[in-house]
A protein has these predicted regions:
Chain A
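Alpha-helical interface subdomain recognition
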Residues: 1-76, 199-332
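Glycine-rich flavin
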Residues: 21-162, 331-332
Length: 332, 392
């Protein structure tokens, strides 16, 4: 049993942390999606290749690397397509011709793939729609999971692809995508890879949430120390101290389940990720709500990272059915 | 980073497992499962203590210089986890976990030589004389006074919430030796023979009908000065050391997880809100287990304890209370049985309706309310966390 980062892991963490610290602070965190230039810069640093399996031309980083990178993204409240574009779609194309066509561009940050659940194959063509496709407006291609559960690749240039923009609560842009008899290329995902992809995407989201929780707690502790009412810092009031202490327990319990999920043996990983999702989404939202409360009126504005952090946490914590679906899966 | 046990640790776990399988009789398991209070009753506890002592594993959490087996933090955790899963009795901690470490840390050689062996054989059974009627969370305000008279202290005062004092023959107590200095500086730590004239124990019946708690009256009890631990006035530092052991000395989660698993078996399939509560408690307990392990692993690798270790007593109290409340709800009316006979595993108990687990559920629910009060209330814990972890 050992919880220390390897030298390589510490280097990756420090690199991502420095990169993000140069771009995000309390006034810029979660203001809007990461710029394409910054995304490309992360690609050029090799970050996405690190998180891509070897079968898709990457370096085959595992769950621990996903956790480390995602937590830093969350700490900066960076709004990126990491989980779905790199972890989910990057694995969906592994082993197919699509990997040659898209793999390098995806890893370099030049092209985005978006995950679009929906549609059905009729006479060899994809028809139907995907209601909300995250980052669907910017995607160069779509990994479609049809209603029958087949994975297909659709080129965003296909004339039968129609996109309508949908702004989401965290400020990121999604698309409502209609497929009007478009050409779809079947993806032959290696055995176990799709389940691994879903587990890692889920892990990335809870790691982002834990990073966001740590930031929101730090900002709140700083704020209650400097905010004066009744002639003293509100941090001197026991009710404020206790609420901050509660937030800390939620953060530590969340980090524990995150670590357990990231370090689980392969056969236990799906269950451990589900457990982390079942707990962390709700804990993160509670913590973000407390952060708003302790910031008073300023917390509900768009001025501070706190209010915007709440929006980001709300989105991340509700993805894929959120804690409700995860707990139902555990109870079954 | 990994959470895997080394081959040596896995072999150790097998050794513990085999020992528990061979040593835990059905009587001991049943006694442990149907314990309604925090600690096993004396008949169960004495038998299990003797088995552990014979094996050399009773004081598994003591360092080797004090007579412990020299286990690492992870080995101790493995032992506790296996004991919990096997359903071993929870031994009273007042001697083994509280005064034992105080003695080998602060005691004179004569005190160690006299008291440590007798603690291990259970010739001495210890009770903790800290709280007083007017001094709970504000422990430093305690008023029991000890006045020096030659080679003795003359001790008078009133201790309360003294767990299992009616089974004990020794009391360790905080007493005020100097009323003229800052409250924390005037306190000393005494070992008191409960057979001495002037010691009276009166029972306090819990809401559950259990007799776990007592009041202890001290009326001019003459305690030899040689039974003071540490210097005069050092009692408060010793008490803080002891309370840190009480709150964080061992892991809480393994026992909660094991109890929850056993309860799930006897409760049967749950649906709706009960199923959701069970999942949430399971998640909280799994998270707590990892929170405890993280600190243990860091200590194993040479780090100082992280402030996160301050969260575990608070969290364990709440999860424990949640588990007992779930049981009461899941068993329905059968979970509201509260016979007056004790212990629940005894022959005098009426035939349980539903299951023995249902019969004990209400008593366990009521007794579990004490978790967020003893050893520092949850409110005190939150204040400690805010200070130590967040610098507030």
């Amino acid at each position: 049993m050992n919880l220390a980062l390897s030298d390589e892991q510490a280097m990756v963490r420090d690199m991502v942390r420095r990169f993000l610290a140069d771009r995000y602070d309390a006034t810029t965190m979660a203001k809007g999606p990461m710029s394409p230039d910054d995304w490309r810069a992360l690609g050029e640093l090799g970050l996405f290749a690190l998180l891509t399996p070897e079968q898709a031309g990457g370096l085959g980083g595992g769950a621990a690397e996903v956790m480390i990178v995602s937590e830093e993204m969350g700490r900066a409240l960076a709004i990126t397509p990491l989980a779905e574009a790199i972890l989910l779609c990057g694995r969906a194309i592994a082993g197919s011709a699509a990997a040659e066509e898209w793999g390098d561009r995806l890893m370099q940050g030049d092209a985005l793939l978006a995950f679009a659940p929906g549609g059905a194959l009729v006479d060899g063509r994809l028809r139907g729609s995907a209601a909300i496709v995250r980052d669907g407006m910017d995607a160069a291609a779509f990994v479609v999971e049809t209603e029958a559960g087949a994975l297909m690749l659709v080129d965003g240039q296909d004339s039968g692809v129609r996109r309508t923009p949908v702004r989401l609560v965290d400020g990121s842009m999604a698309a409502h995508v209609r497929f009007d008899a478009v050409q779809a290329q079947p993806l032959t995902v290696p055995a176990g890879m799709w389940a691994e992809a879903q587990a890692l995407a889920g892990l990335s989201i809870v790691a982002e949430l834990v990073g966001a929780m740590a930031s929101l707690l730090d900002l709140t502790v700083d704020y209650v120390r400097q905010r004066h009412q009744f002639g003293k810092p509100i941090a001197s009031f026991q009710v404020v101290q206790h609420r901050c202490a509660r937030m800390y327990t939620w953060l530590e319990q969340s980090r524990s389940l995150l670590l357990k999920a990231a370090l689980a043996e392969e056969e236990a990983r799906v269950r451990a990720v589900t457990a982390a999702r079942a707990y962390i989404g709700d804990a993160a939202l509670k913590l973000a709500e407390e952060a708003v409360q302790l910031h008073g009126g300023m917390g509900v504005t768009d001025e501070l990272a706190i209010g915007r952090g709440l929006r980001r946490v709300l989105l991340l914590s509700r993805l894929h059915g959120g804690g409700i679906a995860a707990r139902a899966a555990l109870a079954a | 980073m990994d959470l895997a046990l080394t081959p040596e640790q896995r072999a150790f776990r097998e050794e513990v497992r085999a020992f528990l399988a061979a040593s835990l009789s059905p009587k001991l398991r049943r006694g442990a499962a149907l314990t309604s209070g925090v600690f096993a009753e004396p008949d169960i506890a004495r038998e299990w203590q003797a088995i552990l002592e014979a094996k050399g594993w009773l004081v598994y959490h003591w360092p080797d210089h004090a007579g412990g087996p020299g286990w690492t933090p992870v080995q101790r955790w493995i032992f506790e986890k296996e004991c919990a899963e096997a359903g071993a009795p929870i031994l009273p901690g007042m001697g083994l976990k509280l005064v034992g470490p105080v003695l080998y840390t602060y005691g004179t050689q004569a005190q160690k030589d006299h008291y440590l062996p007798r603690l291990r054989t259970a010739e001495h059974v210890w009770a903790q004389g800290f709280s007083e009627p007017g001094s709970g969370s504000d422990l430093a305000s305690l008023r029991t006074r000890a006045v020096r008279d030659g080679d003795h202290y003359v001790v008078s005062g009133h201790k309360i919430w003294t767990t299992q004092a009616h089974h004990a023959n020794r009391l360790f107590a905080l007493v005020r030796t100097d009323p003229h200095v800052k409250p924390q500086q005037g306190i000393s730590f005494l070992l008191i023979d409960m057979a001495l004239p002037g010691v009276t124990v009166k029972p306090i019946l819990s809401a559950s009908g259990d007799h776990e708690l007592n009041e202890v009256f001290l009326d001019e009890v003459r305690v030899p000065v040689s039974d003071r631990v540490g210097e005069e006035g050092q009692g408060w530092s010793i008490a803080k050391f002891l309370l840190e052991n009480e709150r964080g000395g061992s892991s809480f989660a393994p026992a909660i997880l094991a109890d929850l698993a056993r309860l799930r078996t006897s409760m049967g399939p749950l649906t709706g809100e009960l199923a959701d509560r069970a999942v949430r408690l399971q998640l909280e307990a799994e998270a707590l287990e990892m929170t405890e392990l993280r600190t243990l692993i860091e200590i194993e690798h040479g780090a100082a304890p992280d402030p996160r270790s301050l969260t575990t007593k608070l969290l364990a109290s709440e999860i424990r209370q949640g588990v007992e409340a779930l049981a009461v709800d899941a068993f329905g009316l059968a979970g509201l049985q509260l016979p007056v006979e004790r212990p629940f595993y005894g022959d005098a108990m009426p035939t349980p309706i539903g299951s023995p687990e249902a019969q004990v559920a209400a008593a366990r629910y009521l007794n579990a309310r004490a978790w967020s009060i003893f050893g520092g209330t949850s409110e005190i814990q939150l204040t400690l966390i805010a200070k130590a972890a967040l610098g507030l």
